[in-house]
Regions:
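Short helices/loops that flank or line small-molecule/ion binding pockets
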Residues: 72-79, 99-100, 199-210
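Structured C-terminal subdomain patch of bacterial secreted/periplasmic proteins
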Residues: 24-25, 70, 115-128, 134, ...
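His/Asp/Glu-enriched short active-site or ligand-binding loop at hydrolase and phosphoryl-transfer sites
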Residues: 50, 174-196, 243
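A short, structured surface patch at a secondary-structure boundary
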Residues: 25-89, 105, 189-192
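Basic- and aromatic-lined ligand-binding clefts that recognize polyanionic substrates
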Residues: 24-37, 131-184
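Sec/Tat signal peptide C-region and signal peptidase I cleavage site
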Residues: 16-20
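Flexible loop/hinge segments that line or gate small-molecule binding clefts
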Residues: 54, 93-122
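Sec-dependent N-terminal signal peptides
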Residues: 4-14
Length: 269
C-alpha cells in the first residue's frame, strides 16, 4: 500500500512541475508546505497561507483560510500562479478554485516518512531548489540511520501515540505517525486498527509501556495527569508519559520528523 501511495504522490507532483515550475506567487493551504518554503529560503514566493501556517509576521503574508474553509475572493485577488491544497480542504472548494481558472495541486496527508521526503523534494523542484532539497533529505536520512543504530537492542516497548483528546485518537498503520514508533524500535498498541478513534478502556487493556501525547495547551497536561492516575498502567508506573510538540510532530518536514523522532527515542530509553 505504501508503494502505491508513493507512486501517487510522484504523479501528482509531476503534474505540478509541468504546470507551475516557474511559480512566483504561491498560496499554501498546507502548513508543512509553508514550513518547507521557509526552510529553503523561498518564503518570498508565498502570497497566501492558512491561519495555522507558521509564518513570520514581518513577511506580511495574507491569511486566506483556516483549517477547513477558504476565502476564495481573497485567493483570487492575490493572483497566485499555483494554490497548494490539502485533504482537509473540501473537494468542492478545490473544484471551485479550478473552475475559476486557478492551478490547484491537491496534497493528501503524507502516509510515511518517505512520502514526506518525496513531497519536500517536489516542492524544492517547484521553486528551483530541487538539488538543495535532495541534499537536505539525504542528510536527514543519514541522521535517521544513525539514530536507529543507537537504539538499545532487545527493547521493544509497547507505544501509544495519542493525538488529541476529545475524541481520543491514536497513530494507526499506514500513517507517518506510526513511522515514529517503527523507527524508534517500539511496537504500536494500535497496530491492528484501521481507524484512529479509540476509547480509554482500549488503551488501558493494551497497557502501553510508553505514552506520547500530541496535543496543545492545558489539554495535554490534563491528559498526562489522567494517564498517571491509572497506577496499574505500565507507562504510569515507569513515569513514561510525555507531551510532544504538536506542531513539530503532526506536520513535519524531513528535518522536523527526525527532530521529533530523536526526542522520542531519548525519552523512551
Amino acid at each position: 500500500m505504501r508503494k502505491y501511495s508513493f507512486i501517487l504522490i510522484l504523479l501528482l507532483f509531476s503534474q505540478l512541475a509541468v504546470q507551475a515550475q516557474d511559480a512566483k506567487r504561491i498560496v499554501s493551504l498546507v502548513p508543512w508546505v509553508t514550513k518547507s518554503l521557509y526552510l529553503m529560503g523561498e518564503q518570498s514566493r508565498l502570497v497566501g497561507c492558512t491561519s495555522f501556517c507558521p509564518v513570520e509576521a514581518a513577511d506580511k503574508i495574507e491569511v486566506v483560510a483556516n483549517a477547513m474553509n477558504i476565502n476564495i475572493e481573497k485567493v483570487l485577488l492575490l493572483k497566485p500562479d499555483v494554490v497548494i491544497a490539502s485533504s482537509l480542504i473540501k473537494p468542492e472548494t478545490i473544484d471551485n478554485l479550478r473552475k475559476l481558472g486557478l492551478k490547484v495541486v491537491y496534497q493528501a496527508y503524507p502516509k510515511s516518512f518517505e512520502e514526506i521526503c518525496a513531497f519536500f523534494i517536489q516542492i524544492g523542484e517547484l521553486v528551483g531548489q530541487g538539488a538543495n532539497a535532495k541534499e537536505l533529505v539525504f542528510q536527514q536520512k543519514a541522521r535517521l540511520t544513525k539514530l536507529k543504530v543507537g537504539i538499545p537492542e532487545g527493547k521493544n516497548p509497547n507505544v501509544f501515540i495519542q493525538i488529541g483528546a476529545k475524541p481520543l485518537f491514536c497513530a494507526v498503520p499506514e500513517t507517518f505517525m506510526e513511522d515514529f514508533i517503527r523507527f524508534s524500535g517500539g511496537k504500536n498498541i494500535a497496530a491492528e486498527l484501521k481507524l484512529g478513534s479509540v476509547t480509554r478502556e482500549y488503551v488501558l487493556k493494551q497497557d502501553p509501556d510508553v505514552i506520547f501525547i500530541v496535543t496543545m495547551g492545558i489539554v495535554a497536561q490534563e491528559e498526562k495527569d489522567t494517564w498517571l492516575s491509572y497506577q496499574s498502567l505500565s507507562a504510569s508506573k515507569s513515569k513514561k508519559i510525555f507531551i510532544l510538540d504538536a506542531d513539530k510532530t503532526c506536520s513535519p518536514t524531513p528535518i522536523l520528523f527526525v527532530d521529533a523522532l530523536e526526542e522520542m527515542i531519548r525519552l523512551m530509553y
